[in-house]
């Protein structure tokens, strides 16, 4: 079974087993909902059930049914929380998990020519940007906007694009 990272436990918070986590998901409200079960990446058999959760600055605070004091919580420091593929859930049409976009071939929508592959994704503002790595070693960022990204074919691992002038160095 495949597992997906949703948070990294940074530190304890308070005396009753609460932990502060760095979020690694676009869906923290769903992933950290009361009753949701998470597992530890390095100990998949250990299930932790969310007792309560809340946003805290740029982090989240989580409390688990199974962790009741600071000493138990301290042992979780640095651990990665994951969900199984079955718990990942379905996304609406046109919305994709990052892992599905990584390593997709980038294809010129007009010519059908392969331009490279997506090797990184960043979320700096209103839309994501994707790093295209060409076979010749050149790299450039493209925005994930309708004017540029024309079609995403997850089954074939291909993204069809129409590059605006200036996005790709032609020298």
Swiss-Prot record:
GO molecular function, one term: ribosome binding
Domain PRC barrel, chain residue ranges per copy: 93-167
One Pfam family hit: PRC_RimM
InterPro entries found in the cross-reference section: PRC_barrel-like_sf (IPR011033), PRC_RimM (IPR056792), RimM (IPR011961), RimM_N (IPR002676), RimM_N_sf (IPR036976), Transl_B-barrel_sf (IPR009000)
Alphabetically ordered keywords of this record: Chaperone, Cytoplasm, Ribosome biogenesis, rRNA processing
GO biological process, one term: rRNA processing
CC terms in the record's Gene Ontology section: cytoplasm; ribosome
Location of the protein in the cell: Cytoplasm
Keyword rRNA processing part of the UniProt annotation: yes
Subunit structure: Binds ribosomal protein uS19.
Similarity comment text for this entry: Belongs to the RimM family.
Record text about domains: The PRC barrel domain binds ribosomal protein uS19.
HAMAP family, per database record: Ribosome_mat_RimM
Function recorded in the entry: An accessory protein needed during the final step in the assembly of 30S ribosomal subunit, possibly for assembly of the head region. Essential for efficient processing of 16S rRNA. May be needed both before and after RbfA during the maturation of 16S rRNA. It has affinity for free ribosomal 30S subunits but not for 70S ribosomes.
Protein name (database record): Ribosome maturation factor RimM
Protein species of origin: Lactobacillus acidophilus (strain ATCC 700396 / NCK56 / N2 / NCFM)
Gene responsible for this protein: rimM
């Amino acid at each position: 079974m495949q597992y997906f990272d949703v948070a990294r436990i940074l530190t304890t918070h308070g005396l009753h087993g609460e932990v502060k986590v760095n979020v690694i998901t676009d869906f923290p409200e769903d992933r950290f909902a009361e009753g949701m079960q998470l597992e530890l990446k390095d100990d998949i058999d250990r299930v932790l059930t969310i007792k309560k959760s809340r946003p805290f600055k740029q982090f989240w605070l989580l409390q688990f049914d199974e962790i009741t004091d600071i000493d138990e919580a301290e042992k979780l420091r640095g651990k990665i929380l994951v969900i199984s593929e079955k718990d990942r859930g379905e996304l609406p049409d046109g919305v994709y998990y990052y892992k599905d976009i990584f390593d997709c071939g980038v294809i010129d929508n007009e010519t059908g020519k392969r331009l490279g592959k997506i090797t990184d994704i960043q979320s700096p503002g209103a839309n994501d940007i994707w790093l295209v790595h060409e076979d010749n070693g050149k790299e450039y960022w493209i925005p994930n906007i309708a004017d540029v990204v024309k079609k995403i074919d997850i089954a074939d691992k291909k993204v069809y694009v129409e590059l605006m002038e200036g996005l790709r160095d032609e020298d």
